[in-house]
Design a protein with these regions (language model features):
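Structured catalytic core of nucleotide-sugar glycosyltransferases
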Residues: 1-128
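Conserved amphipathic alpha-helical interaction elements at protein-protein interfaces in regulatory
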Residues: 26, 30, 54, 58, ...
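Solvent-exposed polar/charged
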Residues: 57, 82, 108, 144, ...
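Acceptor/aglycone-binding surface of glycosyltransferases and processive sugar-polymer synthases
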Residues: 65-69, 73-83, 88, 100-179, ...
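Hydrophobic helical membrane-anchoring modules
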Residues: 180-311
Length: 311
């Protein structure tokens, strides 16, 4: 009999875990397959870990991995993928914003329709702040234009994948991970299920605008070198502009033209060019930071406690 592993990252989700488990059990009963939960505690400060322990004592199909500190959702998903033993592996959020009933369609899509992955995307962003929705849409359009990653607008991490696809994802051992980009980069035959946005069942989101901005910038850096090309172009244009302004000084001197205004103009242009150069250096230094981080070869996460095996 085949087996499904569902990875559930958790960070301060004490209000959601049992609600999620109870809803999922209704779905599990309809699946004619073995099933395991892999809850990943991402350094929570509340009772998340103790609830995981309690569920594991009641249900042998509940596995948990607890980090020594907060490493982020990307690390939690990676740890879950490494711990999963199923023939089919899924990712879900614990707040029930990922409708559990879609798992039945996902399983059918892989087993009966031959897909390697059945993923989900939101058709609406109802309930989100307008500014957040605006930047999210711009991000998807931008990263698809400047990178070789294929990320569907509104794509969620919620998906079910074959073991072959999961092994391909795990073969990419980069430390600073951007899973949405990785899912698209590895390819495979993917079917998309659409649904309208669902509110959290309890608790509050852990994704602030600052975290989302950092996540987006990290994704662009992971899958595109376009910012470096833009920096190079800006540097060349700045240098040409500088040469043009120097030439104008010589022309004014040669023709005895009064140019005090030009001096002020040159000063302002030099300030502008300096700021552009600093911006270019900032872009390049961010890429160097990523290279430095990879070169240290530190683990993506550190396990503090678990009741399963993490490869």
């Amino acid at each position: 009999m085949s087996k499904i592993s569902i990875i559930v990252p958790c960070y301060n989700e004490e209000e959601c875990i049992e609600l999620y488990y109870n809803e999922m059990q209704k779905i599990v009963e309809q699946l004619e397959t073995e099933f395991e939960y892999i809850f990943v505690n991402d350094g929570s400060k509340d009772k998340t870990l103790s609830i995981m322990r309690s569920l594991a004592q009641k249900d042998p199909n509940v596995k948990y991995v607890s980090f020594s500190r907060n490493f982020g959702k990307e690390a939690a998903m990676y740890a879950g993928l490494k711990a999963a033993t199923g023939d089919y592996v899924g990712l879900m959020d614990v707040d029930l914003q990922d409708p559990p009933h879609l798992l039945l369609e996902m399983y059918n899509g892989i087993v009966n329709e031959g897909y390697d992955c059945v993923a989900s995307r939101r058709t609406t962003r109802k309930g989100e702040p307008p500014i957040r929705s605006f930047f999210a849409r711009r991000f998807y359009k931008l990263i698809n234009k400047i990178s070789d990653a294929n990320i569907t607008d509104g794509a969620r991490d919620y998906r079910l994948m074959t073991r072959t696809m999961v092994d391909a994802i795990l073969s990419l051992e980069e430390k600073d991970r951007f899973s949405k980009g990785i899912f698209g980069w590895v390819g495979f035959n993917i079917k998309w299920l659409e649904y309208e946005n669902v509110d959290r069942v309890a608790g509050t989101t852990k994704w602030s605008f600052k975290k989302l901005w950092k996540y987006a910038i990290g994704g662009i850096q992971d899958f595109s070198t376009a910012p470096l090309a833009i920096s190079k172009f800006m540097s060349i244009m700045t240098f040409l502009g500088f040469l043009g302004l120097i030439a104008s000084i010589f022309i004014c001197e040669w023709t005895n033209t009064f140019y005090n205004f030009n001096v002020l103009f040159l000063s302002s242009m030099l300030c502008l060019m300096t700021s552009i150069i600093c911006a270019c250096l900032g872009v390049m230094s961010s890429y160097l930071r990523k290279i430095y981080k990879e070169s240290k070869n530190r683990p993506v996460f550190i396990v503090g406690e678990t009741n399963t095996i993490v490869k």
